[in-house]
């Protein structure tokens, strides 16, 4: 199973990162004689522009040229952000629109991340694992191969305090919708976590757990294969 950054490494990364407040500015007006800073990305026509820049760079620019603008609309979706979203260019996985995957997360081959899922810094999505809609993998949460994390499920993150152990989900585990796996819990290979379960302690390999807090109710071998099947076709990419 892939392991990634330690809590201390993540804390150092966040501390050292240049904090960013990117904005997108839509402008109508007279742009004659305007000089744009090198840090600006500018698109548009003679009468209209779209500018991508940092909020701190926009302020002096506006003070210098604001009288020439007729209409202004500014979009800002973060403030002093330390962690950008992950560049997915070389990710060999299926990532659906609306998934939030932060830099320094690992997405292994053949994984699937569905709409609205959140993968935080230091988290690992194992080979062939599916993270369903609106599920959350907190910082350093780690899944093995061929895991299914159900819609709305939460694998708690541990960056603070740094001494805490991360959630570890071993291979071939099924986690039902809206289940919560608390910090430091390890779920053994082939286990099944029922929908809505609150998992506060380690789960043995091959066990089925349910309840709040959860307890072992039977063995996974007693569950019909059709109810725990991992479908390879859903992980297939273009040939």
From Swiss-Prot:
**Which Enzyme Commission numbers does its entry carry?**
2.3.1.89
* GO MF term list: tetrahydrodipicolinate N-acetyltransferase activity
Cross-referenced InterPro entries: DapH (IPR019873), DapH_N (IPR013710), Hexapep (IPR001451), Hexapep_transf_CS (IPR018357), Trans_hexapeptide_repeat (IPR050179), Trimer_LpxA-like_sf (IPR011004)
Q: In which pathway does it act?
A: Amino-acid biosynthesis; L-lysine biosynthesis via DAP pathway; LL-2,6-diaminopimelate from (S)-tetrahydrodipicolinate (acetylase route): step 1/3
A GO biological process of this protein is: lysine biosynthetic process via diaminopimelate
What does it catalyze?
Answer: (S)-2,3,4,5-tetrahydrodipicolinate + acetyl-CoA + H2O = L-2-acetamido-6-oxoheptanedioate + CoA
What are the alphabetically sorted keywords of the record? Acyltransferase, Amino-acid biosynthesis, Diaminopimelate biosynthesis, Lysine biosynthesis, Repeat, Transferase
* Purpose: Catalyzes the transfer of an acetyl group from acetyl-CoA to tetrahydrodipicolinate.
Family under the similarity heading: Belongs to the transferase hexapeptide repeat family. DapH subfamily.
Q: What is this protein called?
A: 2,3,4,5-tetrahydropyridine-2,6-dicarboxylate N-acetyltransferase
Please tell me the species this chain comes from: Staphylococcus aureus (strain Newman)
Write the gene name: dapH
């Amino acid at each position: 199973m892939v392991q990634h950054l330690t809590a201390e490494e993540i804390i150092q990364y966040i501390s050292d990162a240049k904090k960013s407040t990117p904005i997108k500015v839509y402008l109508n007006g007279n742009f004659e004689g305007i000089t744009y800073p090198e840090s600006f990305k500018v698109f548009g026509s003679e009468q209209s522009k779209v500018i991508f820049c940092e909020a701190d760079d926009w302020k002096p620019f506006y003070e210098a040229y604001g009288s020439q603008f007729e209409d202004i609309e500014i979009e800002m979706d973060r403030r002093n952000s330390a962690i950008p979203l992950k560049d997915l260019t070389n990710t060999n996985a299926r990532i659906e629109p609306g998934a939030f995957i932060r830099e320094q997360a690992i997405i292994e081959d053949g994984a699937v991340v569905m709409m609205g899922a959140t993968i935080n810094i230091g988290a690992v999505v194992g080979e062939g694992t599916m993270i369903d809609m609106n599920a959350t993998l907190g910082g350093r949460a780690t899944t093995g191969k061929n895991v299914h994390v159900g819609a709305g499920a939460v694998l708690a993150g541990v960056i603070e305090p740094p001494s805490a152990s991360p959630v570890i989900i071993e291979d071939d585990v099924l986690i039902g919708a809206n289940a919560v796996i608390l910090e430091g819990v390890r779920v053994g290979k082939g286990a099944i976590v029922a929908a809505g379960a609150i998992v506060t302690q380690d789960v043995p390999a091959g066990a089925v757990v349910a309840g709040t807090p959860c307890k072992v109710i039977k063995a996974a071998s007693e569950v019909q294969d059709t109810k725990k099947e991992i479908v390879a076709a859903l992980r297939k990419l273009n040939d």
